[in-house]
């Protein structure tokens, strides 16, 4: 572990204290870069909090954990900046990092199985709302939102099949 428990708590408090992933959600560029990497920090905090082999297992304050879970669940439904790589900033990757975060949210032991339908709603809306084709590895990271919870027993394949049957995805030839 590269952090002490004190540092872990400090990072969790700081990253969630000023609006979190909702901060400047309507702005792009540097604001997106900050949100994107904040999403990665959220994902790592939740991963450590959920990992029974980690010294940080269940170490997040319950209030902060709930903020991370709730903001992580809804982040991709709010993010608009689809920049993958920027010549000015490097990798911005908000949708890839947001997908990594959503995967950690769904797989976290404190995320109830009966809320999986919200994840399906968010993904369905995302596929309808985003007009571009992702080309910077966002696709497989979005796929992880579905297959990691299946592998961890948080989601049944039948649930995914039922959801796919109900969604009218726009398909381009």
Q: PLM features: residue spans?
A:
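N-terminal carbohydrate-binding/catalytic regions of secreted carbohydrate-active enzymes
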Residues: 1-6, 10
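CBM-like carbohydrate-recognition segments
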Residues: 155-173
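Eukaryote-skewed repeat-based solenoidal scaffolds used as protein-protein interaction platforms
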Residues: 11-161
């Amino acid at each position: 572990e590269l952090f002490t428990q004190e540092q872990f708590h400090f990072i969790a408090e700081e990253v969630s204290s000023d609006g979190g992933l909702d901060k400047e959600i309507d702005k792009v560029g540097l604001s997106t870069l900050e949100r994107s990497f904040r999403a990665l920090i959220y994902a790592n905090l939740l991963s450590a909090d959920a990992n029974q082999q980690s010294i940080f297992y269940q170490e997040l304050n319950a209030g902060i954990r709930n903020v991370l879970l709730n903001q992580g669940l809804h982040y991709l439904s709010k993010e608009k900046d689809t920049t993958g790589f920027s010549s000015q900033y490097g990798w911005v990757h908000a949708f890839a990092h947001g997908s990594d975060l959503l995967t950690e949210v769904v797989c976290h032991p404190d995320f109830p199985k009966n809320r999986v339908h919200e994840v399906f709603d968010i993904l369905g809306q995302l596929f309808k709302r985003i007009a571009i084709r992702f080309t910077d590895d966002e696709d497989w990271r979005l796929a992880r939102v579905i297959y990691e919870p299946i592998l961890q027993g948080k989601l049944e394949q039948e649930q995914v099949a039922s959801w796919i049957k109900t969604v009218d995805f726009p398909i381009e030839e």
